[in-house]
Amino acid sequence: MKHKKSDNFKTKSVSSSLVRFALDFEPEFASDELKEVAQLSLFDWFVVSIAGQSEPVSHIVRNQIKSEGGNEDCSVIGTTQRFPARAAALANGTISHALDYDDTHFAYLGHPSVAIMPAALALGEKTNVKPEKFWNAVILGLETVTRIGAWLGRDHHLSGYHSTATAGAFGATIVASKLLSLDEKATNYALGLVSSMASGVRAQFGTMAKPLHAGMAAANGVEAALFAQAGLISNPDALEAEHGFADTHTTQDRDTAIALNGLGEYWMLKEVLHKYHACCHGLHPTLEALLQVREKNNLIAKNIENVSIAVPPRYLKICHILSPNTGLEAKFSFRLSAAMVLNGQDTAALSTFSSNACKNPDLIALRNRVSVTPDTNLSETEASVQVQTTDGEILSAKYDINRSLPYKFRKEKIMNKAFALLGESSAFELWDLVATGDPMEFYKVNKIGLT
């Protein structure tokens, strides 16, 4: 049986169309590629969650939900204690975004997995779901958050809303509704309800509230679905009704086609981007281009005369700290991070971006030979580099992090990240656990790297 074409899902509204699609989409409809992306995304999510479990915000949220108690239904990263589904989603979402090292999607400038995976894992455990249904819900959640985020548009983000938290809540609601086997009416009520719950503002960036936004998105999705299951009635069109969520949270005209075109045929979730370097995502195209130059030419730092980097103009305001002094500042420095890569340092490791690196004389010497200029011809996911060697040779590369990567190469990059964060033994153990595909086994993750 083949799934229906996208036109058949276009009913009265974006929300009702996405609900109809989610209800009709069965596990057998998912391609191997979709399953691979979902599996890699869950693995990457677990990696950054385990690595972030000891961050201060992680301790605070875990301690808070411990103080509240409740049904012992669901696992939380960093403890063997179990919690109610909503609390588990809140904690796991926050923990997974604590390092800001999780995946992103440039279609809506948000982080998809930190909202989707915690909701899926919480209700997967609570309902003792079968693997096929779990992965089906994850795929639908990742697609929903991306399409709603893209439909809300850049204006939503630029107005000050945190798309990870807002669009993420709608994606988490679809996940939760699917795992609870809600019917069409109840799922629409759940989406309507979460329209009153989705929140998060960019003024919180740089504080502990930012990772909490991810936990809120996951928890709101779970709670909205549970309320709908209990019979709570909302306006099912509140996402796009007059005085509804979109009407009050964005000023631009919204094109329904962005949310619905190609639904079920063209999958936006395949364009999810995983972070392979422990720094601002705006640096990643540059670092990948420099890696290509270094590896292709067996380049060593002492043979470099100078480095020229061209980047999209907006990143000069975001990640162009000329002479960083702290590890955090190093994560926002084109020049220092370029020097790290060209010196052969592992930029996937959190420890690489340190105050000691900022004082390293070899890195400083090379950093001072790096220049960065804006190029309006580059997309926001591209960078181009030129390295001049001491014998006058010019080595060039251009890289777009939004390009499609083969599964094998993407897995290798994520695995190298896992090695850097968890160590090889723990990384392989985690991969084997995720590869079982059984969410009822995922609680064993707390035996990996538990502090």
Predicted regions located by residue number:
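Hydrophobic mid-domain F-helix/FG-region of cytochrome P450s
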Residues: S41-V48, P118-A120, A167-K178, A338
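Broad structural signal for hydrophobic residues in well-ordered alpha-helices, predominantly aliphatic
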Residues: L123, A176, V194, V293, ...
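Hydrophobic alpha-helical hairpins/lids featuring a short glycine-rich hinge
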Residues: N92-A150
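Hydrophobic face of alpha-helices
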Residues: K35, Q39, F43, I116, ...
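Well-ordered alpha-helical scaffold segments within catalytic/enzyme domains
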Residues: G52, A120-T127, T173-L179, A225-A228, ...
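Short helix-coil transition sites and intra-membrane helix breaks within transmembrane domains
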Residues: A107-S113, Y161-T166, C279
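Glycine-rich, mobile lid/loop segments that gate access to catalytic sites or pores
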Residues: E125-N128, E132-E223, N235-E242
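Terminal-appendage/accessory-domain detector
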Residues: M1-L109, G206-A219, L226-T451
